[in-house]
UniProtKB/Swiss-Prot annotation:
It comes from Plasmodium knowlesi (strain H). This is Phosphatidylserine decarboxylase proenzyme. Changing H195A: Not essential for proenzyme processing, but important for decarboxylase activity of the mature enzyme. Is synthesized initially as an inactive proenzyme. Formation of the active enzyme involves a self-maturation process in which the active site pyruvoyl group is generated from an internal serine residue via an autocatalytic post-translational modification. Two non-identical subunits are generated from the proenzyme in this reaction, and the pyruvate is formed at the N-terminus of the alpha chain, which is derived from the carboxyl end of the proenzyme. GO terms for cellular component: endoplasmic reticulum membrane; mitochondrion. Belongs to the phosphatidylserine decarboxylase family. PSD-B subfamily. Eukaryotic type I sub-subfamily. Heterodimer of a large membrane-associated beta subunit and a small pyruvoyl-containing alpha subunit. Keywords: Decarboxylase, Endoplasmic reticulum, Lipid biosynthesis, Lipid metabolism, Lyase, Membrane, Phospholipid biosynthesis, Phospholipid metabolism, Pyruvate, Transmembrane, Transmembrane helix, Zymogen. It is a single-pass membrane protein. GO terms for molecular function: phosphatidylserine decarboxylase activity. The active site is at D139, H198, S308.
């Protein structure tokens, strides 16, 4: 009888093995979730601690390791015989303008190389070279823009995030005589777009901050799900000045976009799994260059390996005005706003690195 009892116990255990496995996995997940909440609370991050459950489950779905794996897959070299077929399929499926691509598509060795392709400079003229004007830094959707009136920026869904936290430093004016205001513009680059980003006006920068973070998607639904999405995601900020005053130029990582490159900044390494995330207490990597790095309007600044977001926060004269609409599709070099009538130069196009 005892033997039969033991056999029955083993039978019931075997019968319920999936339930036991599920309960065990769920227990580990809940334990990790509790520890994650403790970390956010320990670092006095009350805003993130309140939404720690959302952040935890978003991490499970969109972990940084997944983006690294995707990145490695996209780097895999495609045999010459298959390149035309694969790239022509992507061009047709994603509605990419083939005529704008600078180099023959068969010259791209991998899907990652194709997504970071260059376009022909003459297809992107500079729409305004006058002082105090701004042009689009990228091919993108202009999802939000306006005047920045406090340290909180309200995005298109009505959710606010702290600009100082986003920049990793306190933003401040260069001119304190009441003649200027701060303005901002947020751009979303979809995967099919040209992935390099350029200078929206003539400016110079001396400080680069790398703020390690998550790689959550930046589509509109995520803004509502996570209040301060841009303060959570990994980003690189260039701080400098231009004709109108101070400027902050930010490139933000997103899901499958773990790689941000800035021209002539070989020390910058993004999506490094050894870095403790800044919003969880990790340090902000700040590089101060020996001298200012100057860029002219339309000059290439860097690139993503897939689509993501650019945020430009800039000081300018009070009479600056926009001439675009929210959610408008814009091309790099296209005029977004200025003072007075635009000034164009013949044969003035964007510049890519040689």
């Amino acid at each position: 009888m005892k033997k039969n009892g033991r056999d029955n116990n083993f039978y019931h255990l075997y019968k319920n093995k999936y339930l036991i496995t599920g309960v065990t996995i769920l227990s580990f997940i809940l334990m990790f979730q509790y520890k994650y909440h403790e970390v956010l609370t320990l670092h006095d991050n009350s805003e993130n601690a309140v939404q720690s459950s959302k952040l935890f489950w978003a991490r499970l779905l969109f972990g940084r390791t997944r983006s690294r794996i995707t990145g490695q897959i996209l780097k895999m070299e495609i045999p010459n015989t298959y390149r035309l077929f694969i790239f022509n399929f992507l061009i047709k499926y994603m509605h990419i303008n083939k005529e704008e691509i600078k180099y023959p598509i068969e010259s791209y060795k991998s899907i990652g190389d194709f997504f970071s392709r260059y376009i022909r400079e003459e297809t992107r003229p500079i729409g305004d070279v006058s002082d105090y004007s701004i042009v689009s830094p990228c091919d993108s959707e202009l999802i939000d823009y306006g005047e920045l009136t406090s340290e909180y920026l309200e995005n298109i869904k009505g959710v606010k995030f702290n600009v100082n936290t986003f920049l990793g430093s306190k933003f401040q004016k260069k001119h304190n005589d009441g003649s200027t205001k701060f303005f901002y513009a947020i751009f979303y680059l979809s995967p099919k777009k040209y992935h390099h980003f350029h200078a929206p006006f003539n400016f110079k920068y001396k400080i680069r901050r790398h703020i390690s973070g998550e790689l959550f998607p930046v589509f509109q639904g995520m803004f509502k799900f996570i209040n301060n999405l841009f303060n959570i995601n990994e980003r690189v900020i260039l701080s400098g000045e231009w004709k109108g005053g101070n400027v902050y130029y930010a490139a933000i990582s997103a899901y499958n976009v773990g790689n941000i490159k800035i021209i002539n900044d070989e020390e910058l390494v993004t999506n490094n799994l050894r870095h403790q995330l800044s919003y969880m207490g990790g340090d902000i990597n700040t590089k101060i260059f020996d001298s200012y790095k100057s860029v002219e309007v339309g000059d290439e600044i860097g690139e993503f390996r897939m689509g993501s977001s650019i945020v430009v926060i800039f000081e300018n004269k009070k009479d600056f005005s926009w001439n675009v609409n929210q959610n408008q599709t814009v091309s790099v070099g296209q005029r977004l706003g200025g003072i007075g009538e635009p000034v164009k130069e013949e044969n003035r196009f964007i510049k890519i690195r040689s």
